[in-house]
Amino acid sequence: GVEPQTGMRGVTRRTIAACWLAVSLGLANATALGQARTVYYSGFEPGQDYDAEYTLIDQDGWQGKGTGGNGLVEDNFEGLGQQGYIGFWPPEEDGETFTSLWRPVEGIDPEETKVTFTVLMMIIASTNGQRDDFRWGVYNDNAQRLVTLDFDNETRNINYALDDNIFLPTGYTFENEALYELKFVMDFAANNWSVSVSDEVLLNSKTLTTTGASLTFGDLGPLWVYRKPETPGNNYMVFDEYKLTVETSDEPVKTPPTLAWTGWTDDGRAMLQMGGDATTDYTVEVSDDLKTWTPLETAKPGDTWKEITDPEAPDYEQRFYRARTAD
């Protein structure tokens, strides 16, 4: 492959085999089962008005945050022309901790709640002794981060985080200079997501939001997180054949939970009304500092709403409540 040029702007370890590429490449442009519709595709080629003299940010609707390296390279993936990349060049501004890229997608119908993302990717090792993290992050249309898949270039572990910001191991590792096809399947009606590399499922039916965030697709893009912001590595991630398809979900769209304050009982308990999908279990959680959340009650709203009470509320100066789909 060719290095980027300066742009004018605790679980069993299972290494994903690069030989899977032979079968995955042929699937990169395949039509998904059912009535999947492509809402965005990029091969990052000159024919799509991509210019390797410039950063990827501001080309074909791509946006970004941070001043770290990003742009286009040629023939890192043999026979596939140009690729996008993030990394390699250190940020131009002091104090930055990451550079991120995303490409907003419009025109998804409300009933198209199942979103599939595929991309070819490769992480190139550092030669300066510093190794960073490369991630793919999913955001909803309110710019709230839902889920993250993390490729830790220090340990080569693949980790993930839900919107509680706690990173957990998938149990898989990756290799540098190996070409993978990454696939996200997100079902916003069912509030779940899965990730695979070719035939290997890394995560299956994990929760998209644990905090009651809006279950809508906004964007999905790469991040370069500097492990030592003052001395980032010259590692970088190359990606190509970026594709998003949408289709209707098999799951009916469920109403998100709601909470309303209704006052105090005669014996001093706080009273709340919980609404939502009649047959879905929701967990109401309570906190006094917005950091540590404790389950209060799990219940179904029924056809109208469910009354929730908190007998310990009088013992606290302040009390916060939230509802989420039960595990």
Please report, for each region that a protein language model flagged, where it lies by residue:
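Bacterial N-terminal signal peptides
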Residues: 17-28
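Flexible glycan-contacting loops in extracellular carbohydrate-active proteins
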Residues: 206-238
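Short, aromatic/His-centered strand-loop micro-motif at the edge of beta-sheets
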Residues: 159-181
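Extracellular beta-strand elements of beta-rich domains used
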Residues: 44, 240-244
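Short tryptophan-centered beta-strand motifs in secreted/extracellular beta-sheet-rich domains
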Residues: 117-119, 178-188, 193-195
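Secretory/extracellular carbohydrate-interaction modules
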Residues: 47, 80-157
